[in-house]
Amino acid sequence: MNILVIGNGFDLAHRLPTKYVDFLEMIQCFKSITNEPNIMKAGGLDNIEKPIYAFLDRFIFEECALRGEFNKLIEDNFWIEYFLQCPMYQKENWIDFESEISNVIQSIDFDMKNNNLKLDDGASIVSNFYLEKFFLKRLSAAELGFGQDLHVSTFREMRDVLYQDLNKLIRAFEIYLCEYVENIDHMKISKEINSLGIDHVLSFNYSHTYQKLYDKSKNIKYDYIHGESRLNNTIESNNMVLGIDEYLNKKS
């Protein structure tokens, strides 16, 4: 049996925009367009030469239901705001989602342990600047009479908001992969890969690139180790996994 193990390098070798920075750049373009009244009123983009703009022109102006879902997923999402403000992303146009998520979780764990606080104690001490800024903004909105359900007063509530926003982020990434990445049709087939005679694919990707380009027989078995992207999923049914480092020791 010939088994092929693939990771994100496989998609990148086929020139697919599957890096996290590609996803963030799409979000920035999406926000710029949907927040511009004149463009929305015009009902379309004037320049769609770049593939991402051709996609957004269709996605925003023709697929209103999906656009609405996507907008709700990314709106006031802590993780998206955090990643976009991350110094590494702003300076070097690179980011590691898993590492940054781990950093935020560790900062909360540190705040609680260092100050002898528990989950149901008030989150009055927050050492992470971006975390404090984000929840202060939500608190200000609640005090003004907007979004009362967004008020966060305990570490437990903070944890729950971060978890909900993480699930929203993953679902938004799933839509990006299904609607944009998997509909790119100018990928080149590798003769070397095509001649391997693969029986089983173990994929650490969420996408279906090998299946789309090389599986002509439809007899190949697939295992998606970190889950796979499906457009008809919901936040609840999505099975894509974003992993983080195990930083707690056995005594913790």
Locate each region found by the language model.
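An N-terminal structural lobe/cap that precedes and organizes the functional/catalytic core
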Residues: 1-51
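Extended, H/D-rich, highly charged conserved domains that either
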Residues: 40-252
